[in-house]
Each structure stands twice: as C-alpha cells, then as structure tokens.
C-alpha cells in the first residue's frame, strides 16, 4: 500500500505515531513498553516476557503496587520542591509537568485511582498544604529541609529579640515623659498660705482708724468733717502704699521677713522630707533592680546564642563526619564483567532513547567502562558502569557473580526474596549456596 493522502485517517495516524503521542491504554506499566496500536498491544500481552512479568506480579501484587506508588509520590514531590517550592499552585498544573516525562509512572499503576485522592493523601500525611476551591484543588509544598527550618527559626528569634528591644525602649521613654510632666505640674501648683501675726495686726489697725474717724465726724462741723475725711483718706492711701511696699519687699526679699515655723510645722516638714527620701530610695532601688534584670537577660541571651552556636557547630561536625564516612563506604568498585546482561538507567543518553533498554557486555574497556550491545536494536555503546544496573532473571536461570569473593563464578538462582532484595544462589564449582543482593549478580548472556 502506498502512503495515505493528506488529511486521511492513515496519514493522521502516521503523524500521531511520528510525534510519539500514543494512547495510555496501549501502555504496559509492568514491562514499561508503549505500543502504537491495539494490534501491537495484543501481541505484547500474549508475549512470553509479559506473561513472566504477570506471574511475578501475581505473587507480589501489593508489593509492586506499593513500589510504583512510592516512585510516583517521590517524583511528584521532587517536581514540587524544585519548581513550586514557595508557591500555591493547582494540582493539575503540577501533574501536567510530571507527565511530560515519557517514562513516568502512570497513576493507574498506583494505589490512587484519581488525582483528587492523591492530593488528599498528601494533605493527610502533612507533606503539602491542600485547599479545595471552586477552581479545583490547590497545593503548597511544605519544605522540611533541616537547613531551611533552622534558618527560619533563627530569623523568627531575631525578629522577636528586635521587637522586645523596641518595646523596652518605648516603655522607658514613656516613663521618663510621665516623670517630667509630674514634676512640672508640682512646680506650677499654687499652694494656699496661712495668715501671719503681722497681717492680723495690720487688719486691727485699719479697724481702729475707721472707728476713730466715725467718732470725729459726729462732734465736729461740716468743714471739719470734710478736712478730717480728707485726712482719713490720706491715711488710708498711705497705709495702702505702705502695705503695697511691704508686699513688694516680701516678694523681692522674702528671707528677711521669713516666718519661723512652729513645732507642728517642723514635725510635718520633717515627715514630708522622710517620705520624699523614702520615695527617692525606692525609685533608686527599682532602677537598680531593672538594671540587674536587664543585665541578667542580656547574659541569658548571650548564653543561649553561645549554646546555639555550639549546637550548630556540633551538627555541622556530625554532618561532615557522616559525609566522610559515606564517601569512604560508597567508594565505587568495578563490577562489570564480559557476557552479562545489563539494563541502561541513563535518562539523558540520546535524550532518553536507550533508557531501560537491555543489552549485554561485549568487552570491558577498563575497570569502569564497558562496550555494550543492545538486544533490541543491536546498537553498540560505550558506557560507564554508573549508568548500568544488573538484570535479575527468573528462578532456575544462570547468573554470573560480579561482586565479592566469588566474582566471576557462574551460579544458579534457587530462590528470590522480594522483601529483602536478595536471592539464594547455588555455585556448582564450590558446591555451596549463598545469599547475595541484586546488585552482586546479573543474568548470563
């Protein structure tokens, strides 16, 4: 058959296949294989490799589903922590970013049947802040990085210390203003004074003069009365002038005319002085106590800061020791051997073209570099062992041990422990059965 014309079903199907836009129902999660059409998917379902994977799944269905769920959750949270770390975003937007990877774990393979259930799960486990709105579910990532948490705690403590210092300064300024206003009011107050003996004598003299003038007016003639009245007024004027002069002298020079205090006044004056001294003493003691409290608070703050610094230094030292120990323990050792089947795990190699593809090692170039020939396409690649992983065949198959004392020996798989990620191997040459982890043996080509 020739090529289909433009806009025909065949041409449209070819374009879709060329773009890599295949349907989800034609994708096999167990085998991680995407089929192009329904016929190819049926052929894959009836294949031997798929049936073998289905047998493994039937034995450990819950374990495999939990593994897929764990990988799905980790990848989803990794996108949240890198692209949306401090923002509130729709859950659909994050999921759209997640499915851009062609080799992502599909949600149908997990324990969650929908994105809503997965979002609710994140909210219940306190891994994200979840909010349901008319526009859909919104989520915010909760950053639990130790360095980020410590930085936030230190910033909050610093803000509290600054607020306490500002509040203390404000209260001290208000107290000083109140004391100044109180002293000013006391100075402005005009207190009443008692009448002195001299004032009483002056008042009696005025009364006598007035009485004498009234007597003279009754006995004398009209003319004499006028003259006497004039004299009386003159006397009153002179008395007024004298009293005004005396008042002026009292105001300008109060000390020469100061009155001696009586015994009762002296006692009251002494009591007031004692009260004033006691108040001053109490205020002085309060100020000293406040200063001591401030000094103690400052010392406590300094001690707390020193303790925090010491704790941070200890944590940094422990982290450095852990890193050093991990580096010492994780020193990479060569494990690649000729004629073993391996799987490529490098997502960036040829833009993910060879990701999860199997091949066998044709030759070992050096301790860490191998020449690999792919089983499906026949392509030959040179690739480092860090981008390869071992392949675990079914029970009864022959494998080659790649690590440890029996490196290079052939063995037969007797049993596989999926929970502990290891298997029991029978070495015919030594006639022994040993248990090794998955990464210590691989399928023989």
UniProtKB/Swiss-Prot annotation:
Pfam families: C2H2-zf_KIN17, KN17_SH3, SH3_KIN17_C, WH_KIN17
GO cellular component labels: nucleus
GO BP terms in the entry: DNA damage response; DNA replication
Start-end of Low complexity biased regions: 215-229, 239-253
Zinc finger regions, C2H2-type: 26-50
UniProt region (Disordered), positions on chain: 215-256
Domain of life the protein comes from: Eukaryota
Entry GO MF terms: double-stranded DNA binding; RNA binding; zinc ion binding
Keyword Lipid metabolism (UniProt): no
Entry keywords, A to Z: Metal-binding, Zinc, Zinc-finger
PANTHER family cross-referenced by the UniProt entry: DNA_RNA-BINDING PROTEIN KIN17, KIN17 KIN, ANTIGENIC DETERMINANT OF RECA PROTEIN HOMOLOG
Family recorded in the similarity comment: Belongs to the KIN17 family.
Protein's name according to its UniProt entry: KIN17-like protein
Naturally occurring in which organism (per UniProt): Dictyostelium discoideum (Social amoeba)
């Amino acid at each position: 058959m020739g090529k289909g014309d433009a806009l025909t079903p065949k041409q449209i199907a070819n374009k879709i296949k060329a773009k890599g836009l295949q349907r989800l129902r034609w994708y096999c999660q167990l085998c991680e294989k995407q089929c192009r059409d329904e016929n190819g998917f049926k052929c894959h379902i009836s294949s031997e490799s798929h049936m073998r994977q289905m047998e493994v799944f039937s034995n450990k269905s819950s374990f495999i589903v939990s593994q897929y769920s764990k990988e799905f959750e980790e990848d989803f949270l990794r996108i949240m922590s890198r692209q949306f770390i401090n923002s509130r975003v729709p859950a659909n937007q994050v999921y759209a970013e997640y499915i851009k990877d062609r080799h992502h774990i599909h949600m149908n393979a997990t324990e969650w049947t929908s994105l809503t259930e997965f979002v609710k799960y994140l909210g219940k486990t306190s891994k994200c802040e979840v909010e349901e709105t008319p526009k859909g579910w919104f989520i915010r990532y909760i950053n639990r990085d130790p360095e980020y948490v410590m930085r936030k705690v230190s910033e909050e403590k610093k803000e509290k210390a600054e607020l306490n210092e500002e509040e203390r300064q404000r209260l001290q300024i208000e107290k000083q203003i109140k004391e100044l206003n109180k002293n000013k009011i006391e100075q402005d107050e005009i207190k009443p004074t008692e009448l002195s003996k001299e004032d009483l004598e002056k008042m009696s003299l005025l009364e006598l003069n007035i009485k004498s003038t009234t007597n003279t007016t009754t006995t004398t003639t009209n003319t004499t009365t006028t003259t006497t009245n004039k004299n009386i007024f003159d006397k009153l004027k002179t008395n007024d002038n004298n009293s005004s002069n005396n008042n002026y002298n009292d105001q300008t020079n109060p000390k020469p005319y100061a009155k001696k205090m009586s015994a009762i006044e002296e006692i009251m004056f002494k009591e007031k002085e004692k009260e004033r001294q006691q108040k001053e003493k109490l205020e002085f003691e309060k100020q000293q106590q406040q200063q001591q409290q401030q000094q103690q608070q400052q010392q406590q703050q300094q001690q707390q800061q020193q303790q925090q610094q010491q704790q941070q230094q200890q944590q940094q030292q422990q982290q450095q020791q852990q890193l050093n120990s991990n580096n010492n323990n994780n020193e990479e050792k060569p494990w690649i051997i000729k004629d073993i089947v391996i799987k490529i795990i490098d997502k960036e190699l040829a833009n993910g073209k060879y990701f999860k593809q199997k091949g066998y090692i044709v030759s070992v170039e050096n301790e860490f570099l191998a020449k690999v020939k792919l089983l499906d396409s026949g392509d030959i690649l040179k690739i480092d062992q860090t981008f390869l992983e071992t392949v675990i065949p079914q029970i009864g198959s022959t494998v080659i041990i790649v690590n440890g004392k029996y490196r290079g020996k052939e063995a037969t798989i007797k049993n596989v422990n999926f929970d502990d990620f290891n298997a029991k191997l029978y070495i015919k040459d030594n006639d022994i059965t040993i248990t090794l982890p998955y990464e210590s043996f691989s399928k023989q080509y």
